[in-house]
Amino acid sequence: MASQGTKRSYEQMETDGERQNATEIRASVGKMIGGIGRFYIQMCTELKLNDYEGRLIQNSLTIERMVLSAFDERRNKYLEEHPSAGKDPKKTGGPIYKRVDGKWMRXLVLYDKEEIRRIWRQANNGDDATAGLTHIMIWHSNLNDTTYQRTRALVRTGMDPRMCSLMQGSTLPRRSGAAGAAVKGVGTMVLELIRMIKRGINDRNFWRGENGRKTRIAYERMCNILKGKFQTAAQRAMMDQVRESRNPGNAEIEDLTFLARSALILRGSVAHKSCLPACVYGPAVASGYDFEKEGYSLVGIDPFKLLQTSQVYSLIRPNENPAHKSQLVWMACNSAAFEDLRVSSFIRGTKVIPRGKLSTRGVQIASNENMDTMVSSTLELRSRYWAIRTRSGGNTNQQRASAGQISIQPTFSVQRNLPFDKTTIMAAFTGNAEGRTSDMRAEIIKMMESARPEEVSFQGRGVFEFSDERAANPIVPSFDMSNEGSYFFGDNAEEYDN
């Protein structure tokens, strides 16, 4: 599974395609984006939203959540079998914000899921268009990655909270398919596997019977996905062992935790995709842009170009800084939550600051928040340069880094040294070296210890001017390496825990 995944480009994963050439890929991704845009326009008509309200990111999130909920088969089935008071399993909805007499008002809307599915299919030439749904999921996941630091989830499974740079995609639903698996970080995969093993330890029947067989297949598939993210033979060999274990238990949990730590230096390859909110695609389609004809790529200049000309608004709470809210959404749109802040700042053309220094909470507004004090403001989502999104983890390099987040996961293919604090990481490896995998562990530790600054910096293309659409003239920025580059360094970003 993973080996196929590495040979198909993201766009093919994104569109469930077989091997296609570049033009076909651009067209099928464009078709997917156009479908999301058409759906959004139709929903704005249904909800009687004016142009400004349709460009409000909070309205976009509600509409996106409605369509994801309408197509969530497993949950829909569950809701019908376990009716809960006050929840109609056949309906979906959420808060929609409108301007009334110069004030923002919140109203809850409710729609039949069947109706939403009909509108979605109609916008997608009658198809279910699962690729478009996954695309929306990845956008929500990128927004969560940028907004919340997943320390609690890490601590619960016995991992170090400073490993948050491995946690990309940790809030993606299981049903997000190959495109979703491609953007999950090493830590996310490890966390999912540990949760599974823990269930097996606590529940005797987890691996048994017909259901157990399916569970086992899922377990092995997840192991293969994770194996495919590692770039060294020793890490992959350890994954084979975890996968082949007859009865996964604490030994496997230890191995997985060890592998997650090793990924701080011997980084895994994790894909990055620029997935934008539906309220960006809608107006572009409405203005007559034909995504399918023009073609579109999630990893090239296209999302940057789209953001240069898009007007997106957001509700702002009384003590929030609109510029900070813009940074949050900019990072989410570019999938840059775990990128080095210096690289992001250079590309964006304005300083990108750490999460703990941002005066902004999440983009979504809770139902009990007071609307009287809400204002709206334009999100500044433009960039100075554009860069290609990478899926290589690069190698890391011994520089001074924060005592907080160790290391980063590159988003952009831009050459630089990757800062991290090696002593902090190596300290995590003292102690437990026994167990069946001791020789592999020794080999991995040796590779990490010998990681040398000069051989292991991240090799990338560089950034490009917007006029350079073919990426012919890379500009390689030089960065002040004395500075810290991580976004979450042990600060007090909110948790993502519903």
Curated annotation (Swiss-Prot):
Residues 1-21 are annotated as: Disordered. The keyword Ribonucleoprotein applies. Transmembrane segments: none annotated. This is Nucleoprotein. It is found in: Virion; Host nucleus. A motif (Unconventional nuclear localization signal) lies at residues 1-18. It comes from Influenza A virus (strain A/Chile/1/1983 H1N1). A motif (Bipartite nuclear localization signal) lies at residues 198-216. GO terms for molecular function: RNA binding; structural molecule activity. One of its GO terms (biological process) is symbiont entry into host cell.
